[in-house]
Amino acid sequence: MSIKYVATSKLPTPWGVFAMHGFEDTETGKEHVALTFGTLNSDAPVLGRIHSECLTGDALFSLRCDCGFQLQTAMQNIAETGSGFILYLRQEGRGIGLLNKIRAYELQDKGANTVEANEQLGFPADMRKYDMIQPMLEQIGVKHVRLMTNNPRKVKAMKEIGIEVVERVPLQVGKNRYNEAYLKTKSTELGHMMSEYHFTDEE
């Protein structure tokens, strides 16, 4: 994989001014983003998140998932901490793309869970890859991470590329009546480490 750094700009947000670093995968044409806040110390653990694109949750306020809640909470946590990063990866629908995600939602509306819907469309439950994160983290100067995630695959991916995950920080927010079954499936079938007692209900 060939990841090329492109440019950096300021990104004012409700939680403060982040820096937005643009990257291009020259093999696939996909464009990824790293957000950084404050001064990142390469010798100390940095609070961060690897976030896969979710148009419906991040931008359209969907209650079918917890993605938008996780992104906003991660940005708020980073701002309150004073420094940190988010890698925003263009892997919509756990890697199957937006239109296939809508097809999967249609199957879920008919009774399939999130894993079954992917499989009925001929896809694995999770097609995401994380090999692009190494050059992105190298560019922003991060070697040791306090990773905000419930997904053990992300912890494993970081360790495999030589990034030390000092701590896994749970990010359990956004549970509501529309996504309760989805979150349960992520826990029971995809191995996400979640406890219903830590969710913040959003009705």
Swiss-Prot record:
Q: What is its EC number?
A: 3.5.4.25
Tell me which residues bind Zn(2+). Answer: 54, 65, 67
UniProt-recorded name of the protein: GTP cyclohydrolase-2
Q: What does this protein do?
A: Catalyzes the conversion of GTP to 2,5-diamino-6-ribosylamino-4(3H)-pyrimidinone 5'-phosphate (DARP), formate and pyrophosphate.
Pathway(s):
Cofactor biosynthesis; riboflavin biosynthesis; 5-amino-6-(D-ribitylamino)uracil from GTP: step 1/4
| Superkingdom of the source species | Bacteria
- Which molecular function GO terms apply here? GTP binding; GTP cyclohydrolase II activity; zinc ion binding
What positions does UniProt annotate as the active site of this protein? 126, 128
Q: Which cofactor does it need?
A: Zn(2+)
Record keyword GTP-binding present: yes
One GO CC annotation, please? cytosol
Give the enzyme's main class according to its UniProt record, as a single word: hydrolase
Write down the Pfam families for this protein, in alphabetical order: GTP_cyclohydro2 (PF00925)
Family membership, please give it: Belongs to the GTP cyclohydrolase II family.
Question: Cross-referenced HAMAP family, in alphabetical order?
Answer: RibA (MF_00179)
Mark the transmembrane ranges.
none
Which keywords describe this protein according to UniProt? GTP-binding, Hydrolase, Metal-binding, Nucleotide-binding, Riboflavin biosynthesis, Zinc
- Which reaction is the catalytic activity of this chain? GTP + 4 H2O = 2,5-diamino-6-hydroxy-4-(5-phosphoribosylamino)-pyrimidine + formate + 2 phosphate + 3 H(+)
Gene that codes for this? ribA
A Gene Ontology biological process noted in the UniProt record is: riboflavin biosynthetic process
